[in-house]
Amino acid sequence: MLAVGRMEDEEGPEYGKPDFVLLDQLTMEDFMKNLELRFEKGRIYTYIGEVLVSVNPYQELPLYGPEAIAKYQGRELYERPPHLYAVANAAYKAMKRRSRDTCIVISGESGAGKTEASKHIMQYIAAVTNPSQRAEVERVKNVLLKSTCVLEAFGNARTNRNHNSSRFGKYMDINFDFKGDPVGGHIHSYLLEKSRVLKQHVGERNFHAFYQLLRGSEDQELQGLHLERNPAVYNFTRQGAGLNMGVHNALDSDEKSHQGVMEAMRIIGFSPDEVESIHRILAAILHLGNIEFVETEENGPQKGGLEVADEALVGYVAKLTATPRDLVLRTLLARTVASGGREVIEKSHTVAEASYARDACAKAMYQRLFEWVVNKINSIMEPRNRDPRCDGKDTVIGVLDIYGFEVFPVNSFEQFCINYCNEKLQQLFIQLILKQEQEEYEREGIAWQTIEYFNNATIVELVEQPHRGILAVLDEACSTAGPITDRIFLQTLDTHHRHHPHYSSRQLCPTDKTMEFGRDFQIKHYAGDVTYSVEGFIDKNRDSLFQDFKRLLYNSVDPTLRAMWPDGQQDITEVTKRPLTAGTLFKNSMVALVENLASKEPFYVRCIKPNEDKVAGRLDEAHCRHQVEYLGLLENVRVRRAGFASRQPYPRFLLRYKMTCEYTWPNHLLGSDRDAVSALLEQHGLQGDVAFGHSKLFIRSPRTLVTLEQSRARLIPIIVLLLQKAWRGTLARWHCRRLRAIYTIMRWFRRHKVRAHLIELQRRFQAARQPPLYGRDLVWPTPPAVLQPFQDTCRVLFSRWRARQLVKNIPPSDMIQIKAKVAAMGALQGLRQDWGCQRAWARDYLSSDTDNPTASHLFAEQLKALREKDGFGSVLFSSHVRKVNRFRKSRDRALLLTDRYLYKLEPGRQYRVMRAVPLEAVTGLSVTSGRDQLVVLHAQGYDDLVVCLHRSQPPLDNRIGELVGMLAAHCQGEGRTLEVRVSDCIPLSQRGARRLISVEPRPEQPEPDFQSSRSTFTLLWPSH
């Protein structure tokens, strides 16, 4: 049994050798003993240098998770026991250190654990990146991790060799920014085994997605899809109805997996409508598989009459694909053909033809669905808003998880392509690890003992050779008009490859009874002999589907389904180019994949399947030995023991490590780069672990590189500070010079603008001294910002100068009136219609014989007495008024305003003083906006005085402005503000009571008078 233990930092000798390179004797027996010992001790990982050998334990081991990731993060390969995390970390560090694309190639036969290995690699990369928790990077990481779950549902199935076998090839590129955080990705898929949709071997299942839909969906959803929960009801899922996804984990039920896939699709970014469309397409495929065709009795087989046994299924398919039912039925029973004259002919199917078309449609629908899912994930993972000029060049880590070598009881076209793919990858491994390495040693003049290995190039050539290769012969058979059968194709292969050492058939080897005449051929692959049945080769290679189905599904109302069939928009009469065959497309994709991998720095994970029964803790020595042999692991160990861990051109080596040696920093003065490298290594004491080639340095041990990297890492912060200091100083000097230039330009430009502005001012104000306007209508030019305060001051000075020019000829006796009018204009602010500006102001109207002919002498006597008593200096204003008191009674009174007091006088009693209010107590007055003479005087500590100026000559003369102006001018002279309010409804206060007063014009009113109500006063004003 497999010993399950926790991963320790170091491994003792009881666990065997952690690296096969360290074996004392390099034989197959020693290799297998070490592999078996480590497997029994729970050590499923072993190195061959930097290549990781992984044995599938078929059980969960406590080797993974955040704690294990922390132990491997930032470490070198030899510092921790062998692990997938170590390989992922090495690929990630190589990418960051050298800014070079890397790839991790995971290979091995079906069931060896490749898919699980790729998951752990993705988990490690996601865990060690994005320490700053950038939202966009987190989004990309979530999509990368969750995409595996979705692709497994649609691309994996249970086989007899593997409970979760990838039935497609997957290569994922992960894009990283200059900080090493993932910013995007792209998934390439290869050769989905779509024939599995129709039929599976005994003990196998269809793709997981079908069973997850049936067993994991809610009853209401299944009812809407016209589905039953039992997979045995449907032809396409009946074979695997009694099987589960896997046996290792009880949680791996279809129901729980369906929930996980739905959550993953939500996180990735599939909309609810898109998920619903996916379920409808899966349901339509299941219903399509249950459609049976029968010949109609009335027509008979000779007339080709055909009908569907259960037309309800046609309705289900039509509803789920959002297409017309009649069109679905017609497409299933017949096909349309365009003749040479562009005439469209409808040709009815036979039962066999209709069944073939139905199956082709089901396979194509699932393939298009799978491709759409992959493209959807790619569109979401695509790097967004990446500009190499700003963000730097992106680097890439590629992860290849592709189907392993397969040998089934009956091997068809799919197994042929899968095994060809594995031959190509093995050829790449041979080229990079064995062949190119030995050739480089010879080219560089390094002493080397040649190691023999099997080169599978001849097998690859057998498959892909132009004109004569198996794929070329198959394409020729597909393109030839006439009754070309699989048997004729086999005969052609026998003719072309009769003498090929890796090809055989029953015709060429009649004694080999493992093959049937006219059906089988055999290829001696690097992994073993595989017999292929040619039945279905031509049909699967053509991969044909009637155009009627493409047009039908393209015209679907469902936008998701419609997007999967862009080729359906072609008209039936349109002549199209023959599409490339499935084999050619796969070959081209493999060539492109190998070229892509060859352009990157590779890291290898070689997966081994311990036994055929998928039993935990059991290692079948013979089965594992066979895998070790065909994977070339022993040869890999030999090359590694005799070879070097790293090689670098001298200039590149110096560029990276020259700062660690005083003779090479910053630039060496030695004869050549090779001499400089030698001096650098001698200073570190590492010259014994290297070999000098013609143009490259070869380093034997990874520890040498680690030593140099550690020295470099210690010096980098010092160099960075030095560079930062120099660069910041340069930037500061550049900035200072730029500022000086800016200020010089600003200074001269400012002078220019000031000079131009002053010249313009001088030009405009040349005629400002000419009377009578003195420049009143001149427009001031807009000044530069720097001159705005200066111009504001100039405008004030100009206004004062102009005012001086206007008033200097006015007699001194009129200046009091002028100042009062100016004060009135400012106080009223244009809110009153007429305020007597155009007439002369007499001010003291009670002393005037014109206004007060009968009592002017009496007022003069009273005025003299008041002047002697109160000591005021001048009379500001006097007039007869009509006043209203708090008792709502109106009386004739006189108003006298002096420079010290405001007097209310009684004209009927020789102008006796009724009230005297100190002028400093007067805080404001209120007037209306009309021509009436109402005024309310407000004084602090006194009732408001409500009066109407009247008994003037001429009658109703407008004297409100005169009162306002004289009082406002006097207050200005004393340095205080008089509040003047203009309102048609004036509030007032008398003995604490609040009232309102307004004006009502009346034509019949002979003289102004007051009318009162409970809380209001109204001035009745003659309007004639």
UniProtKB/Swiss-Prot annotation:
One of its GO terms (molecular function) is actin binding. Disruption phenotype: T-cells display impaired migration patterns and are less efficient in scanning and evaluating antigen-presenting cells. T-cells show global reduction in membrane tension, while their homeostatic tissue distribution and responsiveness to T-cell receptor (TCR) engagement are unaffected. However, T-cells move faster and straighter, leading to defects in detection of antigen-presenting cells, specifically for detection of rare antigens. One of its GO terms (cellular component) is nucleoplasm. It is found in: Cell membrane; Cell projection, Phagocytic cup. Unconventional myosin required during immune response for detection of rare antigen-presenting cells by regulating T-cell migration. Unconventional myosins are actin-based motor molecules with ATPase activity and serve in intracellular movements. Acts as a regulator of T-cell migration by generating membrane tension, enforcing cell-intrinsic meandering search, thereby enhancing detection of rare antigens during lymph-node surveillance, enabling pathogen eradication. Also required in B-cells, where it regulates different membrane/cytoskeleton-dependent processes. Interacts with calmodulin; via its IQ motifs. This is Unconventional myosin-Ig. It comes from Mus musculus (Mouse). The lineage of its organism: Eukaryota, Metazoa, Chordata, Craniata, Vertebrata. The gene is Myo1g.
